[in-house]
Amino acid sequence: MSERIDQSVPDAARVGVVSRIGGVAGLPADDQPPIPTRRRQSFRRWFADKGWRHVVAWIAIAFALFPLLYIVSASLNPIGTLTGSNQLFSAISPRNYERLFTDPAIPYGTWYVNSLIIAIVTSVVTVLLCALGAYAFSRMRFRGRRFGLMTLLVLQMFPQLLAITAIFLLMIQISDVFPAIGLGTHAGLIMVYLGGALGVNTFLMYGFFNTVPSAIDEAAKIDGAGHARVFFTIMLPLVTPILIVVGLLTFIGIIGEFAIASVILTDPATQTVAIGLFQLVSGFQSQNWGVFSAGAILAALPVMVLFLLSQRYIAGGLVSGSVK
């Protein structure tokens, strides 16, 4: 006959059930095991371990925020001078912002629209042309392919500003033959910007295209799809992060560009925000830093909005595009 199994609840002291106050139920207070306590770390050890990182982070944040606070304070200060803006937010008035759109001597609205048109058109065309070039280098095999890639790398070493004199002389010659894309036109400036942006961005996209498995487009070609269909319907959706990154970086670089735009755009009606704001503070007796600060803040708004909307694509696009 089998032994009867005891199904009663075991004694708490026998199994060592831990009570809510940290002791063992059923044991005398003197026999309770000691409760482990966390040893307090000294300030010197904490600072050597991780505290210095907090200090460096706060210094970096202060270093980045102070210029922003200063320019916001200057834009709200009706005095319009740098000496009057030494004390942050000592006076607050929307007068500088009103002057940007009410003063006939400051066509800020025209400058703003010109900058947006040039930046948007250049960004869109740059993304399209760079994507086409990157797809060709990544998926096609043709004579001169390696030489073309090396040329793109070499072109990245020379900034576009080095050729500003040659660009000016070339645009004068183009104006005699094709006035629509010559000196003083938006189309001419866009062409100059495209020439400087295609090299580095094509190579950046080329690295991202290489991360897409070639079996995907090969399967589409077996089903009868051509290069155009593979590119527009399959590849472009897969490389969306790098397209957004290239478009955003191009837009940021152009919306505030001054040196080349000041050489190409000689007509005041075609000038951009960067040129117009420079004119506000270039005069010896007519400097108005308050209006300049207000215009600079408004010019930065599109960049901030685009960056916030596309920030989740930036890290992935840059990391994947940097790997060949």
Task: Report residues per predicted region.
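Transmembrane alpha-helical segments of polytopic membrane transport and secretion proteins
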Residues: M1-A57, S286-W289, Q311-K324
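A structural signal for multi-pass alpha-helical bundles of membrane permease subunits
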Residues: R53-K324
